[in-house]
């Protein structure tokens, strides 16, 4: 059943037609004015009510928390500032500063891994990150570009097109956002370019850190590190190619490969880590259709992690004072999603002429970050299906007001997880 959903998403992407999106890695320098100095960005405000328990033990003893009251959250998921400069002679600089959930400070949180105890974090429930900072030299009118610095890793639909005007739901699509870093950004070297009807990119990166992997997020936290540098004992490579041959259709293929064990500070080259690799192989196919007043997007992702069974026993993971996860880690992960929306205002001449849009949409996704090794304990709650329906209203091309009803379906005896979400977002350049 799940394979049929995956292949249906792929086939649908190949049979439809869409307008090219700007790859997120190019956003910093995609302004229309052509100014040497550019300023832009995007931001999101989200208001949510969840009609299920937020107790950290709700998956361990679901019956006990079935009647817990609903809970609400108001947040700023992402606020981003772009800064770019064109030095001339093919040299450019791009940067992107991101404030997640309001920035940093001091906060408390509760985690199942910590036995549900309150844990102090040196953060304000959020982060301030330099998501991009790079220097680039372009050749042959952009057919080849060499970019060095901190760059977006465009693996999967969500990372390549993560700005809020590129998805219908109030929050980023859950599947990819769960199993891989999002937004995925690392320091490395990128070779990329545009040809007629094609865009390509290959990247050489520092490896991910297996000590940060966990059951509920697979390799999602693999880019985290507590140091002032990215450990690069091991390396990774990513690649992406997009095709725009058909009017209104973009089809993309992307992937990542790298080793993750013993990619931390200090190395333990003589211990168990020296015998293990933690090789990550991840592949994704995605598409976007923007034609005939429809927008349809879809993606199918699958990943494999070698030595997953042994990661839980790596040095540094089992100590009570360890900052790393104590979880089991799945050997595979999967995420499949598709969404479609129709612009009702396209049928009203006055609103169409005013460039206003009103999409009614639906989204379905299935994801599982913990496809286990047969020797590992089963945790059936990691298998989730999600259905979301809602609307997007664009009073201006750069601003969207969103509303959706989302419902996660979990296997019995776990409780389903419905929620209502409202949001507003902007995306654009000021200079």
Regions found by a protein language model. Give the residues of each.
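Loop-centered beta-sheet repeat module
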Residues: 212, 218-264
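N-terminal periplasmic/intermembrane-space "pro-region" immediately following the signal or transit peptide
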Residues: 6-59
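Active-site rim elements
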Residues: 121-122, 176-177, 224-228, 326
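Short glycine/proline- and charge-enriched loop/turn segments
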Residues: 57-65, 112-114, 165-173, 219-222, ...
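Outer membrane beta-barrel
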Residues: 28-51, 69-210, 233-237, 242-250, ...
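Positively charged n-region of N-terminal signal peptides that target proteins for export
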Residues: 1-5
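Active-site glycine- and acidic-residue-rich loops that bind
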Residues: 182, 228-235, 275-279
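Outer-membrane beta-barrel pore domains
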Residues: 52-54, 65-68, 118-123, 161, ...
